[in-house]
Each structure stands twice: as structure tokens, then as C-alpha cells.
UniProtKB/Swiss-Prot annotation:
Segments crossing the lipid bilayer: none
Disulphide bridges, residue numbers: none
Record-given protein name: Putative serpin-Z12
Record text about domains: The reactive center loop (RCL) extends out from the body of the protein and directs binding to the target protease. The protease cleaves the serpin at the reactive site within the RCL, establishing a covalent linkage between the carboxyl group of the serpin reactive site and the serine hydroxyl of the protease. The resulting inactive serpin-protease complex is highly stable.
PROSITE patterns per the UniProt record, alphabetical: SERPIN
Length: 423
């Protein structure tokens, strides 16, 4: 495939639904079963460390399973043999064909057409190399990816800055440095990056004049005074009490812009808050483990009915989180991709190509009007050798949150807040 001009969408020969790549490679059943909730096991590993950080004080944490899934799914399209098998297992799909039909992959396509959400994807390939037509087709058809040649060999810093600029533009400046300094060098062959941006307005906004400061109780027993959003009159909300915790569903206004081609709404987003009971019987870390390891936990614990609310207090918060995923992915069974796997389906002459690092960064702000959130995942690939009872929901202590697409159950953002004042 000839080198592509800067910003030019991928083009290539027409293929079938699998983009002309093999779909018969099967993931190990045990791994696929463990990870079928779309990269949530990775979120479990990273979230555990965040909860234990700071000598017990913890650290606010957010990750985008959707962004991470999309990045590794595209890498899987270019992998072959055992390398692809491991990636499919990590992504929770038994085959490449099933991966292409997954709810997360379908939602990614819809995000590009919604007024308040966006998904952008790019691939940068060294000028001396070429993407295979099959991989080019897969990237274009499923992710509307744009390709740019990059001079990694002689100007790696300039190439890094270009990737970061792409992500910054796609996230409206919320994420500016997904690739840190020295993350690419002359041995870099390919960088794949995506960006998710979400802006949701509450269907029932909070009035700023009602916001007040009150203590938020920290994990170490201390407290900080934080701004709490509330309502001045009793009303009904989607709230439910479960053993050890209470769940609150805060829907966003329908940003789907009507029905999709299949006759159903394109998207219906909401934020789910899971608040451990104040008696301390269920720890934040234990609730988080349940959320990321139990199949359909978030869906099953999303309140389905409205109930009267006596008191409603939700803190405003704003923070960012970033991490490198290679070590955690190794723990979860992905090894060949980092040690010189088979990526012959991605780049011509792809022998010895390996994933050097996977970078992820996410940010979120929640206030009286709604939520603004963004995330980016970048994969750097190098060449070897080169009428219910009333319920209270007073979130004055650490809690979990998730931004979820209701129709598919796909999790766009997942995290916890241990201090709403910490950025």
C-alpha cells in the first residue's frame, strides 16, 4: 500500500464484514469468559492501585473501557495466530467476527454521529513502511480512522507532538499529552490512538443556588469541605438500596437525535453512582471488585424504578487520571504482543513488530448542569532490534461512578471519587 497523504482516510479494496482479515482465530475460552465485560479486568488492576495510593488515602480514578477496547480491537485486527488469540481473550471475544459485532464496536460507530459525543481514531505509520490493505479497510470501515505518514526514524518528537495534537483537537483540549516525552523513538513503526469526548446535560439539572459546602469523609478517616449539589424539594429519582450499598441513576438528556437506522434510539446515557453504606461493612475497594468482576453487575444494579428521595447530596468533582497498561495486560494473559508477536496483518514486513506501551488518559468534570468527560488510548508499536420506601443518597464519602450507554450496556467511563476536591 502506498504511503498515505496527511489526514487522508484509509482506502483499500472492498472486503466483507470482517474487512478481509481472518475471523476463525478463537480466543481461549477461560480468558474470554473472564474478560467478557470489555476490559474491566484491566480497570480492576488499575483501580486497586489507585484505591491503595497515598498511604490509605486513595486517589481519584477514571478509565474509559470503551476507548481502551476500541484501541486493542484495532490492534487485534492486525494481529495473527496466537498473538491475535491472546488479544481476543483480553477483549472478551471468542473470535474476530464476534469482536466486530460486539456492542462496544457498534456504539463506537454511533458516537461519531451524535451531537454531544465524538470518537476519533488515527494511525501513524513510519514513512518507510506501509499498512496492509486488509488492515486499512478494517480501520476505515469500523473506526473511520485517518492515517498519516510519520517520520519516526529522524523526527520522533515531531511525530509525538502530532499525535498529541490530534487527540487534543478531538477532546476539545481536555487531553493534551496522551503520549508522554520519550514515548516514541527512531524504532517506532506504528502509533494507533483514539479519543472519546462526551458532554451530557442532566435531564433534571441541579440549581447552582442550592449547592452548599459540607464535609466529605475520606478513606483515612479525615474530612474535607466539598461543594454538594442538591434539590430543595422532595421528589422521585431512580434510586435503590442493595445489600451494602445504594445506587443512584442520573439520566442525561437524550442526545441521540432520534432513532437510528434500526428504528431504535441511537443512545441513552446515564451516570450511575454506587455509594457504600456508612457502616463500613462494604469497602469501596470490595464494591469496585464486584463491579468489574461480576458479569452485568452495573446493568443489574441500575435502578429500574423511581422512588421518593428524602435527601439528595452529590458532590461536584473534576479530575484526571493516566496510566501505562503494559504490566497489567501481561498479568491478564497478553504476552506475545509485547514480546515480538505476529502483526503481519497490520504492516507489510511486520516481522518483529511488538507493542512497546499502551497509554491511557481520562478526565471528567461533574457539576450542576451535567458531565464533560474525555479519554484517549494510544498504542505505540516498535520493531525489535529497532411506591417504594424513601431512600437517602448522600454521597459524603468515597463512591464509584460510571457513564453508561443504556441500550448496549457499554461503559464509557468508570472510576471512583475519594476526594472531590483533588484534581
Amino acid at each position: 500500500m502506498a504511503a498515505l497523504a496527511a489526514g487522508e482516510p484509509f482506502s483499500g479494496r472492498a472486503t466483507g464484514g470482517d474487512g478481509g482479515v481472518r475471523s476463525d482465530v478463537m480466543a481461549p475460552p477461560a480468558m474470554a469468559e473472564e474478560a467478557k465485560v470489555s476490559c474491566l479486568p484491566l480497570a480492576r488492576e488499575v483501580g486497586r492501585r489507585a484505591a491503595a495510593a497515598g498511604g490509605g488515602q486513595g486517589r481519584n480514578f477514571i478509565v474509559s473501557p470503551l476507548s481502551f477496547h476500541a484501541a486493542l480491537a484495532l490492534v487485534a485486527d492486525g494481529a495473527r495466530g496466537e498473538t491475535q488469540r491472546e488479544l481476543l481473550g483480553f477483549l472478551g471475544s471468542p473470535s474476530l467476527a464476534e469482536l466486530h459485532r460486539s456492542p462496544t464496536t457498534r456504539l463506537v460507530a454511533r458516537l461519531r454521529h451524535l451531537p454531544n459525543t465524538s470518537f476519533a481514531c488515527g494511525v501513524w505509520v513510519d514513512r518507510g513502511r506501509a499498512l496492509t490493505p486488509e488492515f486499512a479497510d478494517a480501520a476505515a470501515s469500523r473506526y473511520a480512522a485517518v492515517a498519516e505518514p510519520a517520520d519516526f526514524a529522524t523526527q520522533p518528537e515531531q511525530a509525538r507532538e502530532r499525535v498529541n495534537a490530534f487527540v487534543s483537537d478531538a477532546t476539545e483540549g481536555l487531553i493534551r499529552d496522551v503520549l508522554p516525552p520519550n514515548s516514541v523513538d527512531s524504532s517506532t513503526v506504528v502509533v494507533l490512538a483514539n479519543a472519546v469526548h462526551f458532554k451530557g446535560t442532566w435531564s433534571l439539572p441541579f440549581h447552582p443556588s442550592a449547592t452548599f459546602h459540607a464535609p466529605f469523609h475520606l478513606l483515612d478517616g479525615g474530612a474535607v469541605r466539598a461543594p454538594f449539589m442538591t434539590t430543595e424539594i422532595p421528589f422521585e429519582r431512580h434510586v435503590a438500596a442493595f445489600p451494602g450499598f445504594t445506587a443512584l441513576k442520573l439520566p442525561y438528556k437524550n442526545v441521540g437525535g432520534g432513532g437510528g437506522g434500526d428504528g431504535v434510539p441511537r443512545a441513552a446515557f446515564y451516570m450511575l453512582l454506587l455509594l457504600p453504606d456508612g457502616d463500613g461493612a462494604l469497602k469501596l475497594a470490595d464494591l469496585y471488585d464486584m463491579a468489574v468482576t461480576t458479569p452485568e453487575f452495573i446493568k443489574k444494579h441500575t435502578p429500574a424504578a423511581e422512588a421518593p428521595v428524602r435527601r439528595l447530596m452529590v458532590p461536584k468533582f473534576k479530575f484526571s487520571f493516566k496510566f501505562e497498561a503494559k504490566s497489567d495486560m501481561r498479568k491478564l494473559g497478553v504476552t506475545r504482543a509485547f514480546a515480538g508477536g505476529d502483526f503481519s496483518g497490520m504492516v507489510t514486513g511486520g516481522d518483529g513488530l511488538f507493542i512497546a506501551e499502551v497509554y491511557h488518559q481520562a478526565t471528567i468534570e461533574v457539576d450542576e448542569l451535567g458531565t464533560v468527560a474525555a479519554a484517549s488510548t494510544a498504542v505505540v508499536m516498535m520493531q525489535k532490534g529497532s411506591s417504594l420506601p424513601p431512600v437517602d443518597f448522600v454521597a459524603d464519602r468515597p463512591f464509584l461512578f460510571a457513564v453508561v450507554e443504556e441500550l448496549t450496556g457499554a461503559v464509557l467511563f468508570l472510576g471512583h471519587v475519594v476526594n472531590p476536591l483533588a484534581e
